[in-house]
Amino acid sequence: MNDNDRSGVVRFADAKGRIPTPSGERAVLTLKRGTLDVKLSIPVPPNRQTPHDQDEIYFVISGHGVLVHGGKRDPFRAGDLLFVAAGVDHHYEDFGGDLALWRVFYGPSGGEIPLAGQ
């Protein structure tokens, strides 16, 4: 779905069938509208990420792991929702091959509420 679509359904099975991509990517774009960017992500260890320009939400579909963020370690499992503000260093640890997440970027560059000191 994209900016021209007014509504619709994004199907997990359809998106999962596109992973890995021909270039080996473990995430596929499923919805793009304005600042909203939704991908299905099925990561493999080790999980390397850099801080992002937008706020980010993860909906954990399956699996479990640990979100390492801002000097903290928070365990998560299927059904949980994770939030990472723009600019926060983060990654996953202690997860297996069954981890699947909807990854949602949204809002302006720098986040809805900028980090203190920025």
Task: List the model feature ranges, each with a label.
Residues 1-49, 116-118:
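A short, N-terminal "cap"/entry segment at the start of jelly-roll beta-barrel domains
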Residues 52-67, 107:
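Short, conserved beta-strand element in jelly-roll/cupin
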Residues 71-86:
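Short acidic-glycine-tyrosine-enriched beta hairpin
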Residues 32-34, 68-72, 95:
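Short strand-coil-strand connectors
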Residues 38, 67-69, 101:
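Short hydrophobic/aromatic-rich beta-strand segments that constitute the beta-sheet cores
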Residues 37-38, 74, 90:
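Short, isolated positions in well-ordered beta-strands
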Residues 86-112:
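Ligand-binding loop in jelly-roll beta-barrel domains
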Residues 35, 57, 64-66, 89, ...:
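Structural motif
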